[in-house]
Amino acid sequence: MLGRSRLTFVLLSVTVTCSVAQHVPPWTEDCRKSTYPPSGPTYRGPVPWYTINLDLPPYKRWHELMVDKAPALKVIVNYLKNMINAFEPSGKIVQLVDQKLPGLLGSFPGPFEEEMKGIAAVTEIPLGEIILFNIFYEFFTICTSIITEDKEGHLLHARNMDFGVFLGWNVNNNTWVVTEELKPLTVNLDFQRNSKTVFKAAGFAGYVGMLTGFKPGLFSLTLNERFSTNGGFMGVIEWILGKKDAKWIGFIIRSVLENSTSYEEAKTILTKSKILAPAYFILGGSKSGEGCVITRDRVQSLDIYELDPKQGIWYVVQTNYDRWKNPFFLDNRRTPAKMCLNRTTQENISFATMYDVLSTKPVLNKLTVYTALIDVTKGQFETYLRDCPDPCIGW
């Protein structure tokens, strides 16, 4: 009971701090400049590359990666178990995870079932806990995604991956526990078939879905969570109870990256597929005007907001709120991102200036795990681990 009260106090303290601080210095700042190439206190380090060989049986595809990352995965899985046990000390919930979730594996699409079994075998983590690790990305992805088009019609796509809100606050160093534990698990992935790249992505070791990636020469895709009362928790409950006609958002993104052959095909799938959780799909292409934010509920598309440079719309910015609504007053990353893009101007957009925008507080915040920069046409994909030293807002 004491642990639960302490957690409540910490969350309230963080919320009050954010409500007071987000709109005033030093938690906000003027648009950053000259932060690229990454260096200094906001740069944690590079992200390693691994090849995922799609010609291998699904059970074996992740073995090399998971041999390296098993210790870090065990740390975060154990933390999640301890967090669950803090609310249910009997351990029955974790017991149910270990005993019941593997029985649901036959409901997962494509190769994901065998891939998760392979990860469990290599890491010696119970299969139910590997499934839980893959499920919880449906709920806590709070991000900023941007697509820009310069004066020559060249497209860039960038994102901050913010993850881990309310999953434990470390009062000793003012960080989110899960955010910090995800950084050693962050990897760049080159998915290959016949020794040729099919797509590239940034992900977390142990997670077989995708949240950030691109298909060279064709399109780029990122996912942002969309908050809704009829949200991911409801979708997961329905799925567990047997209603399995909706797709997991991380799995549909991977499927699109792996199988779609054009921007328009990807757009159609992301617009029309029934999904487990509401989401924003941020999709970029390789030609002028090929960039959009698809606002989704679980059943249908609510809005498609597209680049239109002839009408002066040379960028789209998506955080975690519908574009026709004001952001939550405790969490306005949209306004500073747009302000910094406008100050940058269309003539000066580049990897360097996009990184500057994503390095400006509160777009950069305590939840930021990594920043990704994507150039579909040139085939460039860069990912950098981030830090946000104090003073820095919690989200």
Curated annotation (Swiss-Prot):
Q: Which residues form the signal peptide?
A: 1-21
Q: Name one GO molecular function term.
A: fatty acid amide hydrolase activity
In which compartments does the protein localize? Lysosome; Secreted
Residues at the site labelled Important for catalytic activity:
162, 320, 333
Q: Which family does it belong to?
A: Belongs to the acid ceramidase family.
GO BP annotations, alphabetical order: fatty acid metabolic process; sphingolipid metabolic process
What this protein is reported to do is described as: Lysosomal ceramidase that hydrolyzes sphingolipid ceramides into sphingosine and free fatty acids at acidic pH. Ceramides, sphingosine, and its phosphorylated form sphingosine-1-phosphate are bioactive lipids that mediate cellular signaling pathways regulating several biological processes including cell proliferation, apoptosis and differentiation. Has a higher catalytic efficiency towards C12-ceramides versus other ceramides. Also catalyzes the reverse reaction allowing the synthesis of ceramides from fatty acids and sphingosine.
Which reaction(s) does the protein catalyse, per the Swiss-Prot or TrEMBL entry?
an N-acylsphing-4-enine + H2O = sphing-4-enine + a fatty acid; N-dodecanoylsphing-4-enine + H2O = dodecanoate + sphing-4-enine; N-tetradecanoylsphing-4-enine + H2O = tetradecanoate + sphing-4-enine; N-hexadecanoylsphing-4-enine + H2O = sphing-4-enine + hexadecanoate
Query: Which keywords describe this protein according to UniProt?
Result: Disulfide bond, Glycoprotein, Hydrolase, Lipid metabolism, Lysosome, Secreted, Signal, Sphingolipid metabolism, Zymogen
The record's GO CC annotations read: extracellular region; lysosome; membrane
Q: Spell out the subunit comment.
A: Heterodimer; disulfide-linked. The heterodimer is composed of the disulfide-linked alpha and beta chains produced by autocatalytic cleavage of the precursor.
Question: Could you tell me which cysteines form disulfide bridges?
Answer: 31-340, 388-392
Pathway, per UniProt? Lipid metabolism; sphingolipid metabolism
Q: How is it modified after translation?
A: N-glycosylated. Proteolytically cleaved into two chains alpha and beta that remain associated via a disulfide bond. Cleavage gives rise to a conformation change that activates the enzyme. The same catalytic Cys residue mediates the autoproteolytic cleavage and subsequent hydrolysis of lipid substrates. The beta chain may undergo an additional C-terminal processing.
Q: Which PANTHER family match?
A: ACID AMIDASE, ACID CERAMIDASE
EC code(s) of this entry:
3.5.1.23, 3.5.1.-
Native organism taxonomy: Eukaryota, Metazoa, Chordata, Craniata, Vertebrata
Gene symbol of the encoding locus: ASAH1
Which residue positions carry a glycan here? 173, 259, 342, 348
Q: What is this protein called?
A: Acid ceramidase
Active site residues according to the UniProt entry: 143 (nucleophile)
